[in-house]
Structures are given as C-alpha cells and as structure tokens.
Amino acid sequence: MDHARLIESLVRRGIIKTEKVRRAAERVKRELFVPERYKEVAYEDIPLPIGDDQTISAPHMVFIMNEVLDLEEGQLVLEVGSGSGYHAATIAEIVAPSDSPPSRWGAVITVEINPRLASLAFENLSKAGYSSRVHVVNADGSSGLPLRRKVDRIVVTAAAPQIPPPLIEMLADGGKLVIPVGSPGFWGQDLLLVEKRGNNIIKKHITEVAFVPLRGRYGWS
C-alpha cells in the first residue's frame, strides 16, 4: 500500500474524520520514521518495531488519538513516549501547520525515557523538517515536566497502570488527555479521553487497545 491509498482507506473506514487530521496525515511521510528494513511496508496499517522492544504505532491508532484530542492550531501539546517521532510530527502539522505563519504556531513537546529512542526521534524529526515545531526531551514523561505554562493537550503512547497525577496537574482548564490504561501485556487496555473542567476530571472510554507498557515512576517500571 502507498501513502495515498493508506489515507483513503483510513477515511473510508471512518478513522480519519476531519480535514485537519487528513491534511496532517498527507503531509507527514511515515517512511521517514521507520527503520530502513521496514520502509517497503511503511504504509501498511500495522505497528512496526523500532528496537528496544518498542514500536511505532499503526497509523489508524495515531489518527484515532489525534481525532479524539480535538487538536487546534496554536495549542501546546505534550506527548509522552516519542517512539520514532512520527506521531509528534502528525500533531505538529495541526498545531503548527507548515503552511501557516510561525507567529500562529503552537508546539509539541515529546518526552522519551529511552535515550536511544529520544536521539532517534530527534534525528528523524530534524531530517523531516520539524525541529522548530517539535522539541524532544529525554526524561520520564510519566512524571511530567516543569513547564512555565499548562498544556492544552497530552497524548500518552504507552499503557499506564493508572492516569499519572502529574499529567493531570499539567493540563490547562479545558484541556484533554488521551491515554491507554490497563495491563502491561497486549490485552486488557482501554483508551481513555480525560477532560479537565475546573476541579472536575471527566473520563470517557474510547476503545480497547494494545500498547507497549509505559516506563517510569507512574508506569510499569
């Protein structure tokens, strides 16, 4: 399958629903974010290994999460689990689109606990032209980051035993967080949408999922 056919398939299946998510999917080439030996299958709708028992998520899961997040231009987004950088790039094309003036851009901060993968994500994002819109941090993302402002959106790309309290604390009022919660194995996991409204935290089940386990203080290790 090629890039265009993958996107057509995701639209036809109702995975990609909005024009902004479709536009981002079209602009980001997944082949730039997969290991060389997997480039021939870069546009198959499957997860692919990137080393250290980690994967790049299947495209349908990336865009399900992006749709649920309700991303908008100008937002500040935190990603926990950089992987190869692909998901962060697709978010950047919505909050800081390449055809929009930089004065209107938001930004993506992607946090990766694995030093090798943090370097991989940085390298891939730089080569693909996202270094001014996506900032890679090698740290324990489950513990949050000491930022000067609250973030509008958070996406966690690995399964946690529970929603990490520091991430709730980082969310702005009206902010949204998407996170897989459940077993460290590839079963018994639920994708949750969490909304912060004043002192209230509202949770909504989206679908059942299968993610690698989250590492860190509020993860599985």
UniProtKB/Swiss-Prot annotation:
<comment type="function">
    <text>Catalyzes the methyl esterification of L-isoaspartyl residues in peptides and proteins that result from spontaneous decomposition of normal L-aspartyl and L-asparaginyl residues. It plays a role in the repair and/or degradation of damaged proteins.</text>
</comment>
<dbReference type="InterPro" id="IPR000682">
    <property type="entry name" value="PCMT"/>
</dbReference>
<keyword id="KW-0963">Cytoplasm</keyword>
<dbReference type="GO" id="GO:0036211">
    <property type="term" value="P:protein modification process"/>
</dbReference>
<protein>
    <recommendedName>
        <fullName>Protein-L-isoaspartate O-methyltransferase</fullName>
        <ecNumber>2.1.1.77</ecNumber>
    </recommendedName>
</protein>
<feature type="active site">
    <location>
        <position position="57"/>
    </location>
</feature>
<dbReference type="InterPro" id="IPR029063">
    <property type="entry name" value="SAM-dependent_MTases_sf"/>
</dbReference>
<dbReference type="GO" id="GO:0005737">
    <property type="term" value="C:cytoplasm"/>
</dbReference>
<keyword id="KW-0808">Transferase</keyword>
<keyword id="KW-0949">S-adenosyl-L-methionine</keyword>
<keyword id="KW-0489">Methyltransferase</keyword>
<dbReference type="GO" id="GO:0004719">
    <property type="term" value="F:protein-L-isoaspartate (D-aspartate) O-methyltransferase activity"/>
</dbReference>
<dbReference type="GO" id="GO:0032259">
    <property type="term" value="P:methylation"/>
</dbReference>
<dbReference type="Pfam" id="PF01135">
    <property type="entry name" value="PCMT"/>
</dbReference>
<dbReference type="GO" id="GO:0030091">
    <property type="term" value="P:protein repair"/>
</dbReference>
<comment type="similarity">
    <text>Belongs to the methyltransferase superfamily. L-isoaspartyl/D-aspartyl protein methyltransferase family.</text>
</comment>
